[in-house]
Regions:
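Extracytoplasmic/peripheral linker and loop segments enriched in polar/acidic and small residues
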Residues: 396, 400-411, 437-503, 529
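N-terminal secretory signal peptides
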Residues: 1-21, 42
């Protein structure tokens, strides 16, 4: 609750929220009316964010193969980078997940939620001096709808039938009604680029608070404040530097010694040590992120569902949460949705570690010999240790898992979504529809388990157009059961996003949407020194 109040207070300080809105949202969150009024008065008098300074981020996840094309954002580094230099049409509220305006300042659906009209913000400039127009928006969305783009948003864009300009408005027509449609446009790949990025998707030119000055994939990137940025509540520092630090020990040392202001992916095992550092603050956020072991359902031996079930029952989830997450997370149930999502399908039995059931399904599968699991320290914090733990728990069921540690550099292009059994992570998505459309729809480019089921696709489309919430929830329940019992994902844990910063860093927003303040860490914080 304190994080939410701090966030609302910052909105008041920056003139983004009036008294009525502030009190309404704090009362809705369970704060008494009298207390909300006092909080508003205090917030209005609070210190404004400080401007200036050079912000340094030490980030894990960078690779020599990183791309500046937002459609190909694969790593933590490119995720933050595109938020530095670019904007989306729609964002999600960091605490509720509801859609909030960005480059689209308002929207209106048709009665059947099939056609949506978005008013595009005027007076916005790209870093190259060009004014933002609705044509840039149309071109961007069409590029990400093209199979050749290899965009991570392609699964989401397949629900769109037509995209066109109407004066200063964007008109989007869907294949079927979807009440969640605005949140589809908050997919982090859909950064608006001049002419949609068709001229050069790697240009790194957008409308964001920082202009990209240099880019060395897998090494570093630098940005300078864009003086004509259209928002007043973002972009407080003068410049930003991302330094790729894939080694967890090096990141921790860099933060402790003051070489950087912020690091991501703090290993839970080192949190206690970092807490003892006098100038360090731990930033832990619960959300929709999850760590996974992914099997390709169309590749032997994982095309046998009994083998997949054996490997699911061979996972000791409680031990994973305790030893890998250090308690910074919760047990998963082999489908990618948790209770932070609207219409969460309750009542699904929690899958537990069961060596006997694992042995039963393993024998039934007819598989003989070891199973090769590829992993790397960049897959998620503690991924290599998690693979070894999994190897040990599976051994008790008579299953031999061979663990192969792969190099971090190139993991996201050479192993993930390529090899048939590997470790990975997902940051979650704003809605169930978007999560399933991105990673489980048969035609999605990022269907990393090769779960291709026409009956599942049909349920997804039915749920998308179903406006009755009770019926929609039933459909999501059926989809979750199908993924859980027949899919290729082993999801042992939903992770908290554990990062750390210098105490000089102020204004950090804990965002349920995704890691590192949903990618906006550099644009939301300021330096108090």
């Amino acid at each position: 609750m304190s994080d939410y109040k701090n966030y609302l207070a910052n909105q008041v300080m920056m003139g983004k929220m009036n008294r009525r809105e502030f009190i309404g949202r704090t009362v809705a969150a369970g704060v008494a009316l009298s207390s909300a009024s006092t909080l508003f008065a205090t917030s209005a008098e609070a210190q404004e964010p400080k401007k200036g300074g050079h912000l340094k981020l030490g980030l894990e996840g960078g690779s020599a193969t990183d791309s500046k094309d937002p459609g190909k954002n694969l790593s933590q580094v490119t995720f933050v980078s595109s938020h530095n230099w670019g904007d989306l049409l729609v964002e999600s509220d960091p605490f509720t997940g509801a859609p909030v305006p960005s480059l689209a300042e308002s929207w209106e659906p048709s009665k059947d939620a099939v056609t949506w009209t978005f008013k595009i913000r005027s007076g916005v400039k790209f870093h190259n001096g060009k004014d933002l127009t609705v044509d840039d928006v149309v071109a961007t969305l069409k590029r990400h709808s093209d199979e050749k783009s290899e965009s991570g948003a392609l699964g989401v864009m397949k629900s769109i039938k037509d995209i066109k300009a109407d004066g200063g408005n964007l008109v989007v027509t869907l294949n079927e009604g979807n009440a969640d449609m605005p949140l589809l446009l908050s997919a982090y790949h859909l950064v608006i680029q001049p002419n949609g990025g068709l001229d050069d998707p790697e240009a790194g030119i957008g409308t964001g608070p920082y202009k990209m000055m240099s880019w060395e994939p897998g090494v570093r990137a630098t940005y300078e404040k864009f003086p004509e940025y259209w928002r007043t509540d973002r972009g407080f520092v003068d410049s930003v530097e991302i330094i790729v630090m894939n080694d967890a020990t090096a990141r921790m040392a860099a933060l402790s010694s003051g070489q950087v202001h912020f690091i991501n992916r703090v290993d839970p095992k080192t949190v206690g040590m970092l807490k003892r550092a006098p100038n360090v603050e731990i930033l832990s956020t619960s959300g929709r992120g999850h760590y996974v072991f992914i099997m390709h359902c169309n590749t032997a031996p994982f095309d046998n569902n009994d083998l997949r079930l054996a490997l699911k029952y061979a996972m000791d989830r409680e031990t994973m949460v305790k030893k890998i997450l250090g308690g910074y997370g919760k047990v998963g149930n082999d489908f990618p949705i948790n209770s932070t999502y609207a219409l969460f399908p309750e009542g699904i039995e929690q899958r537990s570690y069961d060596p006997d059931k694992a042995a039963f399904h393993y024998k039934k599968s007819g598989h003989d010999g070891s199973v090769l699991l590829r992993t790397s320290e960049v897959a998620f914090p503690g991924a290599v240790d998690a693979a070894v733990l999994y190897q040990e728990s599976a051994k008790k069921a008579g299953i031999n898992i061979e663990v192969k540690r792969e190099p971090g550099d190139g993991y996201w292009t050479n192993v993930w979504n390529v090899q048939p059994f590997s470790t990975s992570y997902w940051g979650g998505r704003p809605t169930q529809d978007q999560m399933y459309s991105t990673a489980y729809l048969s035609t999605a480019d990022w269907n990393d388990t090769r779960f291709k089921r026409p009956d599942f696709d049909k349920l997804l489309l039915q749920a998308r157009s179903e406006l009755d919430e009770a019926k929609r929830k039933e459909l999501y329940h059926a989809m979750a059961m199908m993924v859980r019992d027949e899919g290729g994902v082993i999801l042992p844990m939903f992770n908290d996003f554990v990062n750390a910063s210098s105490k000089k860093v102020k204004g950090y927003v804990h965002d349920i949407g995704n890691d590192m303040s949903n990618g906006y860490v550099a644009t939301r914080v300021w330096l108090d020194a």
